[in-house]
């Protein structure tokens, strides 16, 4: 397993029967360094990569090394051999792991210190032999992109891969994805894949795998646990539940949002309860919400999107000419507004919206508040917008409404049919009943 090392570094390891995953000690001058030998992705062929006890990875030049000693062999060789056999034959796997990129599948370039989305999911599994205690897995690298570069055409490819995984006999699918646009992809898959045979679990990481505070391992273990044991057939997001490593939460894919830029527990269910929590140490899934979609016999694929849709975040002073240009001088077929409060914009745009809806453009209203639902019957401006043809979208998140509109536009041309689908609760994107416990509160006592 020294194939990641070349030239002199490879020869040294081969002569000492040292393989990746072994615990070794290196003496260099007065310094003794002990750690686990990792694969090297350095362009410098004279670098060993070691994981220290404190969790950090370091690169050590082979120059001036006085001694390299094997301490213990990798104890997971038998499990690794079994994992390779599983990977060679997808039919033997229970859970398919599909990698699309992001921090959870990242590596460090030791020349620059930069983190790049290039480490495959299989290589992560190599350093998480515990996964084999949960389920037999098979890994596929679909593509390796930063999540900000995600596009609707990639959603289609992911959906097709999920469908294929179920057709091959897998009972669950895990999708490794960057966290920034994970909620968009989760929504796209929820509308594209119906009658799911098992869970489709999106998972990511807020901290790269080289950092001691990384959430990669726990999130991936939790995701595989969810894919293995969950009773539902839904698209979900599985991420850290708190700032420690206690447990993970499983969120419905169309009711979740990344609510913090860097915290490990950044993802929260909005206007909904999490479906489950995962006690990752015990490999146990605890259901929190019984109103889930049950597994079906055969997954249906219907993945197509029309991206002639626009998400407008309303703000005071929005230039009317700018908005008019979007509605009249582009190929736009639909507009989702993230409005203020109960679903408002300035009344200055009412006639502009009226003309657009008469021209066949769908306009849907969501709220910037995120929590709560739109109610455009309370105030005068809301009623004026309703009269102009703006459609209230209940408690749908703005991003979910946008993805749903892209999916609907690809299936319907008639405005009334588009409206009918947009206000229909297709995959749990609308929660008809809100309770007090759905809104998070912060206590300063």
From Swiss-Prot:
It catalyses: L-glutamyl-tRNA(Gln) + L-glutamine + ATP + H2O = L-glutaminyl-tRNA(Gln) + L-glutamate + ADP + phosphate + H(+). It is an enzyme of class 6 (ligase). Pfam families: Asparaginase, Asparaginase_C, GatD_N. Residues 93-425 form the Asparaginase/glutaminase domain. The active site is at 103, 179, 180, 258. Keywords: ATP-binding, Ligase, Nucleotide-binding, Protein biosynthesis. The keyword DNA-binding does not apply. GO terms for biological process: amino acid metabolic process; regulation of translational fidelity; translation. One of its GO terms (molecular function) is asparaginase activity. InterPro entries: AsnA_fam, Asp/glu_Ase-like_sf, Asparaginase/glutaminase-like, Asparaginase/glutaminase_AS2, Asparaginase_C, GatD, GatD_N, GatD_N_sf. The keyword rRNA-binding does not apply. Its EC number is 6.3.5.-. SMART domains: Asparaginase. NCBIfam families: asnASE_I (TIGR00519), gatD_arch (TIGR02153), PRK04183.1 (NF003217). Belongs to the asparaginase 1 family. GatD subfamily. Allows the formation of correctly charged Gln-tRNA(Gln) through the transamidation of misacylated Glu-tRNA(Gln) in organisms which lack glutaminyl-tRNA synthetase. The reaction takes place in the presence of glutamine and ATP through an activated gamma-phospho-Glu-tRNA(Gln). The GatDE system is specific for glutamate and does not act on aspartate. Heterodimer of GatD and GatE. This is Glutamyl-tRNA(Gln) amidotransferase subunit D.
């Amino acid at each position: 397993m020294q194939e990641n090392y070349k030239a002199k570094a490879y020869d040294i390891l081969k002569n000492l029967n040292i393989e990746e995953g072994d615990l070794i000690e290196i003496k260099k001058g007065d310094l003794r360094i002990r750690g686990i030998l990792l694969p090297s992705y350095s362009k410098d062929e004279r670098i060993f990569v070691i994981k220290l006890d404190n969790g950090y990875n370091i690169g050590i030049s082979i120059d001036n090394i006085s001694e390299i000693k094997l301490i213990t062999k990798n104890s997971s060789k038998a499990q690794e051999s079994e994992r390779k056999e599983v990977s060679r034959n997808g039919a033997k796997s229970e859970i398919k792991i599909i990698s699309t990129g992001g921090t959870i599948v990242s590596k460090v370039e030791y020349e620059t210190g930069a983190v790049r989305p290039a480490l495959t999911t299989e290589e992560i599994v190599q350093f998480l032999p515990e996964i084999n205690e949960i389920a037999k897995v098979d890994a596929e690298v679909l593509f390796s992109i930063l999540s900000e570069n995600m596009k609707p055409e990639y959603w289609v490819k992911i959906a097709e891969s999920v469908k294929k995984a179920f057709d091959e006999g897998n009972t669950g699918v895990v999708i490794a994805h960057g966290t920034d646009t994970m909620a968009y992809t989760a929504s796209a898959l929820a509308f594209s894949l119906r009658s799911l045979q098992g869970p489709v679990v999106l998972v990511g990481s807020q901290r790269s795998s080289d950092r001691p505070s990384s959430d990669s391992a726990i999130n991936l273990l939790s995701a595989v646990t969810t894919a293995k044991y969950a009773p539902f057939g839904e698209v979900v997001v599985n991420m850290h539940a708190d700032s420690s490593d206690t447990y993970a939460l499983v969120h419905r894919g169309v009711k979740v949002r990344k609510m913090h830029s860097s915290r490990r527990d950044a993802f929260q269910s909005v206007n909904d309860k999490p479906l489950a929590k995962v006690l990752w140490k015990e490999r146990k899934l605890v259901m929190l919400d019984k109103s889930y979609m049950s597994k079906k016999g055969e997954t249906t694929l219907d993945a197509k999107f029309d991206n002639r849709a626009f998400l407008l975040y309303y703000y005071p002073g929005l230039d009317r000419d700018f908005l008019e240009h979007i509605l009249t001088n582009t190929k736009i077929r639909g507009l989702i507004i993230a409005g203020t409060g109960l679903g408002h914009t300035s009344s200055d745009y009412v006639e502009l919206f009226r003309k657009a809806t008469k021209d066949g453009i769908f306009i849907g209203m969501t709220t910037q508040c995120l929590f709560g639902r739109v109610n455009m019957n309370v105030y005068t401006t809301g009623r004026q917008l309703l009269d102009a043809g703006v459609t209230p979208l209940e408690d749908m998140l703005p991003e979910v409404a946008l993805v749903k509109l892209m999916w609907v536009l690809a299936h319907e041309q008639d405005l009334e049919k588009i409206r009918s689908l947009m206000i229909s609760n297709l995959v749990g994107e609308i929660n008809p009943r809100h309770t007090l416990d759905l809104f998070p509160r912060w206590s300063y006592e």
